[in-house]
Amino acid sequence: MVTLWWPCLVLALLSGLETSGFPRSPLRLLGKRSLPEGVVDGIEIYSTKISCKVTSRFAHNVVTTRAVNRADKAKEVSFDVELPKTAFITNFTLTIDGVTYPGSVKEKEVAQKQYEKAVSQGKTAGLVKASGRKLEKFTVSVNVAAGSKVIFELTYEELLKRNKGKYEMYLKVQPKQLVRHFEIDAHIFEPQGISMLDADASFITNDLLGSALTKSFSGKKGHVSFKPSLDQQRSCPTCTDSLLNGDFTIVYDVNRESPGNVQIVNGYFVHFFAPQGLPVVPKNIAFVIDVSGSMSGRKIQQTREALLKILDDMKEEDYLNFILFSTGVTTWKDHLVKATPANLEEARAFVKNIRDRSMTNINDGLLRGIEMLNKAREDHLVPERSTSILVMLTDGDANTGESRPEKIQENVRNAIRGKFPLYNLGFGNNLNYNFLESLALENHGFARRIYEDSDASLQLQGFYEEVANPLLTNVELEYPENAILDLTRNSYPHFYDGSEIVVAGRLVDRNVDNFKADVKGHGALNDLTFTEEVDMKEMDAALKEQGYIFGDYIERLWAYLTIEQLLEKRKNARGDEKENITAEALELSLKYHFVTPLTSMVVTKPEDNEDQTAIADKPGEEAISASTAYLTSQQSSHSPYYYVDGDPHFIIQVPGKNDTICFNIDEKPGTVLSLIQDPVTGIAVTGQIIGEKGNNASSRTGKTYFGKLGIANAWMDFRIEVTTEKIILGNGDALSTFSWLDTVTVTQTGLSVTINRKKNMVVSFEDGISFVIVLHQVWKKHPVHQDFLGFYVVDSHRMSAQTHGLLGQFFQPFDFKVFDVRPGSDPMKPDATMVVKSHRLTVTRGSQKDYRKDASVGTKVVCWFVHNNGEGFIDGVHTDYIVPSLF
């Protein structure tokens, strides 16, 4: 089932903060004045309001959070909001002590140039990241002086889409602390009239919800208000933490006295079409199921469960078959069969015996399914007034038979020839989702990701419920010739029960007296035509009262829908066509101030007397590639970085300084060193040293490298062991093993791990902490050298001030001075004197390599080299960092 998110409520309010010093001591607090309730580490979030205004399914949403720093020193305050992936951010403002810093939407390339020019020091990453199944997280943080107030305000818009007969509004509430004034205020205006409206919360009892929640609707207007008091927010009567942690949902629908409804405002029109009471068109459905080895275990079990449930819901008028593909292709029957009780019972027995096998031959599986549907129609095995549907489920990329994506697309396109839709279900993250989406879109279907979770079978069933009841086929929405411009998509292969078709456009003449819309389609029994006529004077009078919401809503709805459809069309366009589509979508995105995949929101924020600029981009559904995932944090050439690579060379680009310090650690192979240890986030990173081959392997004088790395998060009970051969992910007692030959992304709540075949892997924690491990491969027959690993910290700004380790101790700013530069023993490498941490050291100018972009060549990094295992620069001596094991 696809859940339809209502944008003004699809957000998580995650008010958090990072401090620049150590945590407060409880003993110190005893002597301080008492702080107002709801203050956490000196920061009080005293107001959060979500204001939502919905007019004719188009939602305009404003999230406002107000905070004050009641501490006696500056603090960092973070503002996090989760919003639907289908929503477009339209504005963000940051106000500190009455001074407002607005965001502006610019072309992505222009924004990137501004970003690189503006940031002169420190690290600033992209602000919007994918978060879970349907959400994106918008994050911005700012330093707030003692006693100062800050206001965050985010605005975004979205067209609500109807699913299974209703619009669902979903709110994930998680303020993380008591908020003196917390409010959700939603106003709905529907010219057709509201037929039902309800609201509920998973995190609060009905008794408490009843007094905090009010909901009402009458005629065209609906209202929902949720205002819990401080006491109602408490997790227990005497607790100071909040129970607001869960889902808040609102559902509603509108009256449908006629199949269609047309609204016209300021020269723009929108046509909603959702007929009811029609008989269901019989469907001919071919399920093409991946049974390759990667589907083993839980995936194949959940697939069987979902298919059995789908069989229970099949109607006797339907026809079906199952096509299984691995290295080859097998089918349940040679042709489609009717869903009689006897055939369904036989189908259940077949499904129960589905087993995983070997490789993934997507091409042959799809072509067999297409051939079966085509033949059923040609041989008159299915009713004349029926509709065909092809559904594919796969969890990976094609790796046998025809495996070139572009060739598979060509073969499928030529075989289907536009006669029926293809729906692609991508199971998990180890697949090319862009390919599945392009393949489906160009064949009049869509792609859907099925998340590897306990409810995967329910997700599969939910998809089937969407397409189970076609009421019309070949639907065409027609308007007066020469009377309209810039029409959105007006042709659809199916209309499914409980959904809604939406078409928008512009009128050539705003002063017309009448407007007519015709909808034609093939029904189960006959061809149908629905006509909607609009008297413009009556329309103007009827819509005057909606002005209190927002008057240009139809124009913005048209722009939103046009951009959305252009971006879909762009995915399969080539050459000049793609350039023209891109230019049109970009022009509209800029005109209407939408953050889309073609634009970025530029946010300038004050930081220590110097403004810094960050950009908010629109992430896509496809998993972020490694290059994107870690380069967003390195967009400025002056961003601080920390890494260890080579023999092993530790490289520290000092925060706030345009200079770099490096040192080596000489230890015998087998030694395990602590690189990062953060007791607050629970993150720890260790590395084990390897030596050269043969007799040199155990020598302390030969070259040494890191051959094994361990990354763990104690609070998540998660660990990763990385060697030059394999990667082992441990989640509690469960282990998953991958090789460096894989290209795969593994996600779970709070974490994403991406392996890029034979290159690198990216580990990203939700808090804004990212690492990259680079694989260095040498000639296997080399007599001395062997493969080794490099470790790079590319985003550490959310790690605590208590972080330590050979790398971690340098995440916080520190000062040093270099002077008395003089000739060294090597004429090309001058010596100098460095004063750091109260030590006076002799250092040497040299260079190392940064291998993130190219593991074979690398990029030169000039640094001051500290001798003797970093003595005087690192805390203590290097042997203090030796630990007994990786974990």
From Swiss-Prot:
Residues covered by the VIT domain: 29-158
Glycosylation sites: N91, N580
Gene Ontology MF term list: serine-type endopeptidase inhibitor activity
Residue positions where Aspartate 1-(chondroitin 4-sulfate)-ester is found in the record: D647
Keyword RNA-binding: no
Pfam families: ITI_HC_C (PF06668), VIT (PF08487), VWA (PF00092)
Residue ranges occupied by any VWFA domain in the UniProt entry: 282-442
Signal peptide: 1-21
Protein transport keyword on record: no
Keywords on record: Cleavage on pair of basic residues, Glycoprotein, Protease inhibitor, Proteoglycan, Secreted, Serine protease inhibitor, Signal
Propeptide segment residues: 22-33, 648-887
Single GO biological process annotation from the record: hyaluronan metabolic process
Compartment(s): Secreted
GO cellular component terms, A-Z: extracellular region
Superkingdom assignment: Eukaryota
Changes after translation: Heavy chains are linked to bikunin via chondroitin 4-sulfate esterified to the alpha-carboxyl of the C-terminal aspartate after propeptide cleavage.
Function: May act as a carrier of hyaluronan in serum or as a binding protein between hyaluronan and other matrix protein, including those on cell surfaces in tissues to regulate the localization, synthesis and degradation of hyaluronan which are essential to cells undergoing biological processes.
Subunit structure: I-alpha-I plasma protease inhibitors are assembled from one or two heavy chains (HC) and one light chain, bikunin. Pre-alpha-inhibitor (P-alpha-I) is composed of ITIH3/HC3 and bikunin.
UniProt record similarity statement: Belongs to the ITIH family.
Protein name (database record): Inter-alpha-trypsin inhibitor heavy chain H3
Organism: Rattus norvegicus
